[in-house]
Amino acid sequence: MVEALILGWNPEYEPLKGWILNAAVTTKIFIDIFIGVWAFILAVVWVYWIERRPGEKVEKVEIWYRFPKFVIGYFLTFVIVAWLTSAAINAYAASLGVSVSELTTEQFKAAYAPFSAAVNEMNSLRRIFFALTFFSIGVISDFSVLRKEGLGRLALVYFVCLFGFIIWIGLAISYLFFHDVHLLFLK
């Protein structure tokens, strides 16, 4: 929807259709890695200072058990996809006898076309797995226990933090990384 509004106000950006999604995905990966760093810090603090009993020796593997492993997946996925994309675009530019910075928008799109095709093929699987994820969470959740523990207030705090803090950080990160990206592609 945002992309449609931007393209409606700025028709000259039409060649960049899809860049907002790419920027959003990259920002999401950065934010998830940032969350992973804080999750690691919290795991260390929790293991060594909050749950540690006097005289008890804490094993370092306990931090590994508490660390959210999905962060490693995000990081590796980001690095692998960035490397593959860069290698493919560099190879395409080399086959034309030019540097990547000399590629026109059409040539850049042609170099990126195999990745766009792969993403289009994976979109149906992405939707299915996304639905299965939330279905699974709903199936295994015992909401009566959550209600009894008073986690409704925690959900309210999360909601307030999300809209009062987290979204603004995401917007700031997006702006810092992507505010002039369209200028790179509109030659």
From Swiss-Prot:
Subcellular localization: Cell membrane
TM regions (residue ranges): 29-50, 70-92, 128-147, 154-176
Membrane topology qualifier: Multi-pass membrane protein
Originating species: Archaeoglobus fulgidus (strain ATCC 49558 / DSM 4304 / JCM 9628 / NBRC 100126 / VC-16)
Statement: the UniProt record of this protein carries the keyword Lipoprotein: no
Keywords noted in UniProt: Cell membrane, Membrane, Transmembrane, Transmembrane helix
InterPro entries noted in UniProt: UPF0324_pro (IPR018383)
Superkingdom of this protein's organism: Archaea
One GO cellular component term: plasma membrane
Full protein name: Uncharacterized protein AF_1618
